[in-house]
């Protein structure tokens, strides 16, 4: 496609610079054929946005609340590669908002952070989830209560698949008391604007968060 910038009260020189910037932002599919002496000032694609709070990019880093109980268990999540939420539309809708490629930091209430992973398949009702050719509910889950309300779309558990990049047992959860680390009772929350928590996650799990984001 051809992109043309229309602006008022800009010199030709300034308008060209604005146009070049917009072309850069529009991504890898467009080529900026006007190079000039400003070319060296443009960062590589998919780099600057990873360090800018609130920048619009494809995937994000999110806090995920494990919420252990009768229908969910961290051991199951870690062993089989998934996360879940359900029991009501307010929790269902939160897990449905995860996108493929999002990075999640799993938090276990009363313990700390227990894993970092990448969403590989968006959430669907647990009754529809097939894992390695078998229904998830056919596996020997620690919490078989996951099958509760399986035919009720409002109350059913919803499951998203995850590729765990780093995990620990619940007893080894990563936490630092009175340090201001971010937590919330929500199922999902952005870790944008939480630099201290992100830094703690990176050091605790020996991962570079920007390198994980697409």
Feature-to-residue mapping (PLM):
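Short beta-strand-centered aromatic/proline hotspots
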Residues: 113-125
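Structure-specific nucleic-acid interaction/processing domains
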Residues: 1-54
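Contiguous surface segments at macromolecular interaction interfaces
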Residues: 28, 39-69, 84-90, 127-214
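Short, well-ordered loop/turn sites that connect or cap secondary structure elements
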Residues: 95-99
């Amino acid at each position: 496609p051809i992109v043309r910038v229309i602006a008022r009260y800009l010199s030709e020189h300034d308008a060209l610079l604005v146009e070049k910037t917009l072309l850069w932002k529009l991504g890898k599919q467009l080529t900026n054929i006007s190079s000039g002496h400003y070319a060296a000032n443009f960062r590589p694609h998919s780099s600057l946005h990873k360090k800018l709070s609130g920048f619009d990019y494809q995937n994000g880093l999110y806090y995920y609340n494990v919420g252990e109980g009768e229908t969910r268990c961290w051991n199951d999540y870690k062993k089989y590669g998934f996360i879940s939420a359900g029991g009501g539309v307010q929790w269902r809708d939160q897990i449905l908002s995860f996108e493929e490629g999002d990075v999640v930091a799993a938090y276990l209430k009363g313990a700390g952070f227990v894993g970092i992973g990448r969403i590989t398949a968006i959430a669907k009702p647990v009754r529809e989830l097939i894992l390695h050719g078998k229904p998830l509910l056919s596996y020997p889950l620690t919490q078989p209560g996951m099958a509760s309300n399986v035919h009720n779309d409002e109350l059913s558990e919803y499951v998203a698949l995850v590729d765990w990049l780093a995990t620990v047992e619940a007893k080894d959860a990563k936490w630092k008391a009175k340090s201001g680390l971010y937590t919330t009772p929500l199922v999902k929350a952005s870790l944008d604007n939480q630099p201290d928590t992100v830094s703690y996650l990176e050091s605790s799990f020996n991962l570079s968060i920007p390198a994980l984001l697409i």
